[in-house]
Structure formats: C-alpha cells, structure tokens
Amino acid sequence: ALALPGGNIIIFEGLLKLADSPEELAGVLAHEAQHIFLKHSTQGILRNFASGVLLALVMGDANAVMDGLVSIAGQINTLGFSRKMELEADRKGMELMLHAKINPQGMLSIFEKLMKEELRLEVSKNSSSTKKNSRKIFSYLSTHPSAQSRLKILDNQIKENSKKFWIP
C-alpha cells in the first residue's frame, strides 16, 4: 500500500490477496492513513528540496556531478527521517486500531505476512554472494526499519494498551 499527498491510499492487488481478514486490511490502512495525517510525504519532499538547495549553495557551481551528489546526499539525509516516519505511522496506526476497538492482532498479523513475503523474495533474488552483498547494502539504505524491530514494537504496544482499549 502507498499513501499519496492529498489523502489517497493505493492498495495493491497482492496485498488484498495476502490479507485474510478485514482486521489485517484495517491494520495496513491505519498505518497508511497516519502517513497522510502526519503529512509525511510533504515533509519528505520539502526535506529533499532543502537538502539539495543547501548543498548547491555551499558548493557554488551545481554542475552535473554536483547535481548527482546533491541527489544522493538528499536521499541519504532522509533515510533516518523515513525510518522514523515509518515507526511513527506504525505506532499511531496501532493507536487508531486500539481506539477503534479493532482487533490489533490484525495489524501484527499482516506485518508478519509482509515480512515473510519480503524474506521469500529476498532468498529467491539472492543466489550469488555478490547479490547477497548488494542486498545487505540495499537493506542498510532502506527507508523502512527492519521488520523484526517493527513487529516487536507493535507487539509491545498491544501488550501495554490492549487492556485499556481492546478487550479480546
């Protein structure tokens, strides 16, 4: 799924096939809705633009090489913020699920399925050691936190708050 500026959420067919319950789909929608409510796309666009302008000003001449460096620097600069935004959307999305009295296990369950699917794709793509090394680098540069850490955080949030909001 993907949250767009302006409030639209794109849900891919594969996700609909992967979800076994309305609660799982609600978990994804709660997460994506938080990206919209918190204006994460707008913040990312502005941050990239500001980074590019700042580097161009500092370096003076923004020739083709500098344009490339500015672009790379902007992307690297936003990685930490993007990871932070993903965790924030997870946390706020789970809060939304709990307050709406929707079974919070749905969000945890769909994220577990997505993690398994990600691992399955990773294994099928990484047959050689060169591909494995490039995958490790890509993993480091990923804008999303590790699936394991996200699942652990969500599980803890359910344990801490389910008695207050959700009664299984």
Specify the residue positions occupied by each region the protein language model found:
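A Zn2+-metalloprotease active-site environment signal
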Residues: 1-168
